[in-house]
Each structure stands twice: as C-alpha cells, then as structure tokens.
Amino acid sequence: MSISSKDFQNVTSAGFADDTFAADTFAADKKSPFESSVFENKTQVLPVDSVSRLSNGARSRSNSNISLSEPHALNDTVEDQPVSKWVWVLAFAAGIGGLLFGYDTGVISGALVVIGTSLGGHELTNGGKEFITSATSLGALLGGIIAGALADFFGRKPVIAIASIIIIVGSIVQVTAHHLWHMIVGRFVIGWGVGIASLIIPLYLSEIAPSKIRGRLVIIYVLLITAGQVIAYGIDTAFEHVHNGWRWMVGLAMVPAAFQLFILIWLPESPRLLVKKERSQEAYNTLARIYPTAHPYEIKTKLYLIQEGVRDPFSGSRWQKIVKTFKELYFNPSNFRALILACGLQAMQQLSGFNSLMYFSSTIFEVVGFNNPTATGLIIAATNFVFTIVAFGVIDFFGRRILLLLTVWGMIAALIVCAVAFHFLPKDENGNYTSGQSNAWAIVVLISMIVYVASYASGLGNLPWQQSELFPMSVRGLGTGMSTAVNWAGNLGIGASFLTLMSEITPTGTFALYGGLCFLGWLGALFCYPDLTDYTIEEIGELLKHGFGVRESMRHLKRVRQERAWSREDKEQNN
C-alpha cells in the first residue's frame, strides 16, 4: 500500500463549514479489502469536534519542526483519545514473560543455599555458584542477540511462544540434574528463553502502547518481573526445608510459561509489524480496539503515520539488507545516539550491582548472620515489587529523566552506608563475620539494601526497558538486540564476579565499587539522557537527529504540562 504525502496534505488543507468537514480520503495504489473500505476515494463527513481535535491537537504538538502540512502533525488526534481497558489486560497477559524473567533470577538465590550435595555428592563452592548463575546470563546474552532478528522474521507473538517453550525445556533439564554441569546446561537453556523474552516483550508492548501510557505499559512488564521475584522467594521459603525442595523451586517456572503459551492465542500482533507485513486490515482492527472512541479517520491517520515509519528503506537480497541495517544503525547519527542511550542505560542498570543482590541475597544474609536468610531475601524482593508500583504511578507525571537522576542518588547513598556497615561488622581471626541478626550493623546492612532496592525499583530498574521507543522500525530489532545484549553481558559479569569480589576486595570494597559505578552512570545520564515522556515513537527520531536533545525534551515536557493545565481549565469552565 502506497500513499503519497501530497494526497495526505490535500486532506489537511480541506475546508469546513458549519457542523461538518469534507475530506477526500486516500486512493491506494493496490486494491485490497482493507484499502477498499478504508482508503477508497470517497467523501467522508466528520463532525466538527473531530476536526477540532485534528487541527487543534496538531497545532499544539510541541515539536516546532513539525507543521500541520506534514503527516506527523495529525498524529496527536488519536493519541488524545481514551484508551480501551483491553490494552491494560493485553499488557498484563504479554507481561507474563516478565514474571518468568523475575522468577528465574529470584529462585536461584534460595536454591543455591539448599542444593547441598545434590549435584555430584559434594557441597557447592563459590565458583560452582557463580557458574550456575552466570550460565543463565550467558544464555540470555546469546538469546537477546538473536531475538531482534527472530522478531523481525517471524513476528512478535511467535517469538514470545518460542521463549516460553525454551523456558519449559530449561526447567525440565534443571529438575532432572544430578551433576553440576547438568545443572549449568539447564540454566544456560533457560537463559536463552529469558533473554529472548527480555527483548521481545518490552518491544511488543512499546509498539502496541499509546504514547501517553507507553511508559506505564512497559513498567507493567517490569512490575511482573518483580512479582516473579517475590513469588520465587516465597517458593524458596516454602520448600527450603523439603527434601530436594530446590527441584520444585526451579521446576515451577514451567507453570507460567505454559500459561503464557495458552493465552497467546488471544493476543494481537503488533500493529506496526502488521503494517510492515502488509496486513493492514488486522492493524486497523487492533488500533480500533485500542482507541474505541476514535473516529475512523483518526485511526486511518495513525495507520498512515505507522506506514511511513515502517517503510523498508533497504532493497536487495536478505544479506544486503542485513548489512544496510547495520550501517543504518551505526552510521545514521539519530540511530547511533539512540543506540548509545539504550546501551548506556542497560549497562548502568547492570553495573549498579542490583542483580548480584537478586542472585546472592540469601548468601549475603547468611554471611551477615541472619537465621533465616531466604525469608530475609523475601523482604528485598517485596521492596522491589512495591516500589515498581510507585514508579508505575509517577513515571509519566515526573518524567523519565527527573525520576532517573533523583533515584540514582538514593542508590549511591545506600551503597555507601552498606559498605560502611560491612566494615564495622565483627569478624573472627579468619576474617569470617561472626555477628548475628541482632547486631546493629547487620540491621544497617538490611536497611541500606532496602533503601537501595527501593531507589533502584523507582527508576533505574524500569527506564532501560523503555529502549524500544528509541529506535525507528527499520533498526528496532537490531538496536534492541544490541542493547539487550549489553544488559545480559553486564549481568554475566556481575553474576560471575560478585562472590569473588566479596572475597578479594571485601564486601566493603565491593559495595563501594558499585556506588562509584552508579555515580559515573548518573553523570552520563545528566548530560545525555533526554526526557521522552509524551513523545510518539516517530517523533523521537526527529529529536535525536542533531544531538541528544536534553534541553529540547525538557522544553517539550514543560509545554505539554502547560497545555494539559489549559485543557483542564477549559473543561472546568465549560462544566
């Protein structure tokens, strides 16, 4: 389907009188069932209120480089419409992959404490624990690299199904493990599934979400990650004293994976991917469900804008297209800045050390002297869950940038306090900690970790997963694949080095190191991270064309809030 900008501009320049607006719709080059019903050359009559939304909404769009005569200028009309509750149900259904992600990262913490001699007849060493945790990260790294290409080739829904199947297989391998390397293979396999899911689900949600709630929809995915971690710690606690209970811990990951496979039947495909695959009728139907009160013209306008955004700029063989896609990502300034932002945020998230706490919190609290380290770890997971809900409520109010810059300082302060507390914990002549949970410094360690996790969950735990919004459709699969690979590479490094760092440079040095890395990340965000709140995916590319757009994004956010305040005042006066 091909529609010229000239045809579109004829619509925007049409006049209107009294209560109606006459608009010539677009004539399609190809005749399809969709085009004959949506873009057939007919005259439509739109109510004045629809026209008002089209013109006023377009003129109020804050990007000063976009005029009413351009297609992008009309995008705001449908985005201003009420969103169907179906979108929220869809987000929770798709986000079950996040629950799997969280369950897998959380459950291993308790399992490592109780595996005992089940793997080969001898106790796990620190090296064995690091191998088990890092195998998942290595599998996820490789899965994340290929997930983007799989998503572009097969579609978003089939790849979610592939991830669920791989997780089920990995769970079975772990349950049947009787040797260390058998367990490592199972962790590696499940890592593939988790890595694929960690890319495809935020990508899917960002493509289907209206711009005004895109941040919150992606946070639902992160919220379900944290819910999975809470469930994992609860399962760990329940099976801690059961013979071979760790097999139940790792095996129960099959349940949500199987459930997600089942509900995929009712999930729609991404409208942007449907348009790219020339399945425009399905895309129209999906958008109509997302915006149930929107006028058909507004949905057609949205479809036109999506079509312009997903138009394949590359020609040639598949290999030539792959090469051109790499060049477009790395040599197009806008796309390369998007890649820097996405990879930088993912690296910042992992190098903050959070996942070392998820993987080894039970081990840490056992070292500190808590009598029930797994139950204590549940407090950490619950904190993560609660403050992810807080982030859900405030991300689109405060904006992404302010939220990130403020919460990272909470992480830094908590890590410094934790480092100091470890320094003052009593030790024996061999350097082993001898305090119990009644020791004041042990309590300080716990409180500082709670503050650290609360700060992380409110900002850095969520924002990197908004990465899909940074990339245009032409490089989205590759760009999100690269940034997700950075996430899992950092995760691999953290998981493989944490216990070694605790031994070699002491817990004080380890947590101080994480605090220093957080500060470096904060500096990078201060100078390079724009606030993308209320930008459509198509507009973000324009913002990044000539720089990182930090100042322009802040002006944009200020204008949007001012416009919303005026809109509320107008409604109050009209009432």
From Swiss-Prot:
Positions bearing carbohydrate: N432
GO CC annotations on file: fungal-type vacuole membrane; Golgi apparatus; Golgi membrane; membrane; plasma membrane
Entry-linked SUPFAM superfamilies: MFS general substrate transporter
InterPro entries reported in the protein's UniProt record: MFS_dom (IPR020846), MFS_sugar_transport-like (IPR005828), MFS_trans_sf (IPR036259), Myo-inositol_Transporter (IPR050814), Sugar/inositol_transpt (IPR003663), Sugar_transporter_CS (IPR005829)
Cytoplasmic-facing ranges: 1-86, 151-156, 208-215, 268-349, 398-400, 463-486, 532-575
Keyword Transcription regulation: no
Keywords: Glycoprotein, Golgi apparatus, Membrane, Transmembrane, Transmembrane helix, Transport, Vacuole
GO molecular-function terms, A-Z: myo-inositol:proton symporter activity
Catalytic activities: myo-inositol(out) + H(+)(out) = myo-inositol(in) + H(+)(in)
Positions of transmembrane segments: 87-107, 130-150, 157-177, 187-207, 216-236, 247-267, 350-370, 377-397, 401-421, 442-462, 487-507, 511-531
Side Lumenal, residues: 108-129, 178-186, 237-246, 371-376, 422-441, 508-510
Descriptive protein name: Myo-inositol transporter 1
Organism of origin: Schizosaccharomyces pombe (strain 972 / ATCC 24843) (Fission yeast)
